[in-house]
Amino acid sequence: MKGLYIHIPFCKQKCKYCDFVSFPCMEDTADKYVDALKREAEQYRGEKLDTIFIGGGPPSILTPKQIEEVTKMCFDVFDVASDCEFTTEANPGTIDDDKINAMLNGGINRISVGVQSFNDDELKKIGRIHDSKTAYNTICHLDKMGFQNINLDLMTALPSQTFESLKNTLNTAVSLPVKHISAYSLIIEDGTPIEKEYSKGLLDIPNEDTDREMYMYTVDFLGKNGFKQYEISNFAKGGYECRHNVKYWTGEEYIGLGTAAHSYIGNCRFYNTSDINEYIGGAEKEVIELTENDKIAEFMITGLRMNRGVSKTDFKSRFGKDINDVFGSEFDKFIKLGLMQYIDGRYSLTLDGINVSNSILCEFV
């Protein structure tokens, strides 16, 4: 079965670090956009799905009626498994009871809340529209309303973030009724407001060494509090790993609907335009046929992000080659350095390897 990703490119206020495709939300434009989603979905009518993920600007910016239309489309057009994991993203400050009810009634059973921090000063410096109290109350209310599978997103290496403020954020996070936590380091993207402020010396952002120490502390703290790391940036209580994202990391097929979304089907990737007007107007997809080397590189880079790593057997069945014939020298080098390990037929990163994963993964391209 495939996964389905739906991109909602609207936001109330763009965060200072964000370089994603997003636009101010006007109801008439959003209505046209939802109609365009329905039109695109028809290209895949009857496809079997066992995961759905609505992401973007966030989706909670939509009206209850628009949320209802999007969820109804999923079940009308696709063959959705009875145990489908159906996730939507939401931000504190953009959600209310009518929207929550539309989500639950529409079959959504998992929600990912963009908290980032429980420190108000840090939130202001990255341009979030909510404060820590709103974030805390939102998660408690989602639980009360019936969401039993809640993820919260956190960020480290934020402007003025200290170990003390990080510890407070993590303590608050694990005290909440959540089953999954994602923790990402702030990446300063070119052309974003935060990059401009940083280049002018207006922000005190933790250096690379401190960022790594914060990451290692986060991994250790979450593990001790029942959240097992299963991917570089993702932690879950038993049985609550994000099945949709695992599809990406294990090279399974998925469909992408909406601006800037892409699909992976067969040997091809299909890319949608990032221009919302072109998308609403029915712009054609860009199609790129993947070479075997492309697929091998993706298999390695995404697979090694997961704690379980990559399987020799899986590699052989997919590509008809022994993984050691292709990457034997790389494995030997990183195992000797203590950055990788080989256990029960799988190559994976050690904790030290995870800490410098970017430099390791580029060796497998």
Predicted regions and their residues:
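Immediate flanking context of iron-sulfur cluster ligation sites
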Residues: M1-I8
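Local cysteine-cluster metal-coordination motifs and their immediate loop/turn environment
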Residues: P9-F20
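A short, conserved structural fragment
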Residues: I335-G345
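Minor-groove-contacting beta-hairpin "wing" of winged helix-turn-helix DNA-binding domains
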Residues: R346-T350
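Short, amphipathic alpha-helical interaction segments positioned at domain boundaries
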Residues: D352-V365
